[in-house]
Amino acid sequence: MNSGTVKWFSDAKGYGFIIPDGQDREVFVHFRSIEMPGRKTLQTNQRVEFEFEQSERGLHATRVVPLPM
């Protein structure tokens, strides 16, 4: 698993971006990839662990686990 910080996440749109630790690239995250009970959302600057894949549209998270704040 990789670690990173949420750059931003829109509840209305259901997606946002994560910045992996030590990198300047962004990883797209959709709410369906968030592993948590209840409402699946993330907060700006929240720490997460995640897995990601490369697609034709860029990097996207496939599994996101929010860390305690």
Model-derived segments and their meaning:
Residues 2-33, 38-39, 63:
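S1/OB-fold single-stranded RNA-binding interface
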Residues 3, 49-51:
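Beta-strand secondary-structure signal
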Residues 9, 51-55:
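Short beta-strand micro-motifs enriched in acidic
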Residues 28, 42, 55-58:
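Non-catalytic, surface-exposed connector residues within folded enzymatic/regulatory domains
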Residues 30-32, 42-44, 68:
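Alpha-helix boundary/capping detector
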Residues 36-49:
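Short nucleic-acid-contacting surface segments enriched for D/E, G, S/T with interspersed K/R
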Residues 54-69:
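OB-fold/S1-family single-stranded nucleic acid-binding modules
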